[in-house]
Amino acid sequence: MSLRAGTPLPRRIRSTPEAASAPVRKRSATFKSEAVRAGVLSLLFLLLLLGIWHVATLQKEQAAGANDEYAKLMGKGSVKTTGFPTPAQMGATALKQLSDPFYDKGPNDKGVGIQLGFSLARVGLGFALAALIAIPLGFVIGMSPLIYRALDPFIQVLKPISPLAWMPLALYTIKDSSISGIFVIFICSVWPMLINTAFGVANVRREWLNVAKTLEVNAVRKAFLVILPAAAPTIMTGMRISMGIAWLVIVAAEMLVGGTGIGYFVWNEWNNLSLTNVIFAVLTIGVVGMLLDLVFGRLQKLVTYVD
């Protein structure tokens, strides 16, 4: 096929940086728009919950007023009832607690910041001890089918036991409530990390191990350069689960042993009949738990690779 004179030649389409980055910008804009819509929807849900809460507490106050009038008619005097706290009362309590979270007026009167510090310290120590034992042991179990079969019955027996069931034995043996709380955190944190580490190590791709064997990589280098990066996402999942369980357990443990911690703060405020402080502490526990999960979620993304 011949081209006639004067026929323009087809131009070669060149990929410019602007053209290559266009899909990326489009995906980024889509993600931002979805994030904005999700944020607006979350705000609407929050306003709806606050509205329901406000209406419910108003009905409670009206019912209490009717009971007061009935009591006066019956000659029993005025009945003083506080009812469930309103959102306005909770806002005032939150402002008061957050304005001075680190006050210390005695053994039974400490700020929520100090109590959170005690709880986070116990969780951190128990979690770190569990990681130091569970991850190396999980490596050994995952790399040796024989050791897996030998230890699996013990793991299956000990794993379902509630961590709080160990508290009486810990208090009797250790005779220190704070260390007993750390021990309970260790017990509840060790199993998810141990099982996930063993699973991740045992399921490393055979072709990667075969390449390391072909290159005559020694066992230590293979463990750190091949197995650990491949199993890291699964290990981090176990650590994330362990942290969530540890934060759940420490609240109940501190209610049992008393002394310090956010769990003790909740129980102490309940004994003082301060329902607003109880609700504030419960919400604080939820926010801290969410932040801990976000941290481990970020770490999990850092070690996760795409095939």
Q: Where is each model-derived feature located?
A:
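C-terminal transmembrane helix and the adjacent membrane-cytosol boundary/short C-terminal tail
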Residues: 202, 280-307
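Loop-to-helix entry region at the N-terminal start of transmembrane alpha-helices
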Residues: 114, 118-122, 172-194, 231, ...
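Transmembrane alpha-helical segments of polytopic membrane transport and secretion proteins
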Residues: 1-47, 294-307
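Transmembrane alpha-helices
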Residues: 183, 187, 220-253, 280, ...
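Short cytoplasmic-facing helical segments at TM-TM junctions of multi-pass membrane proteins
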Residues: 192-241, 262, 266
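Transmembrane-helix boundary motif in ABC transporter permease subunits
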Residues: 125-155
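Generic hydrophobic transmembrane alpha-helix motif, especially the helices
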Residues: 142, 152-192, 198-200
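Periplasmic/extracellular loop-to-transmembrane helix junction in inner-membrane transport proteins
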Residues: 27-28, 60-128
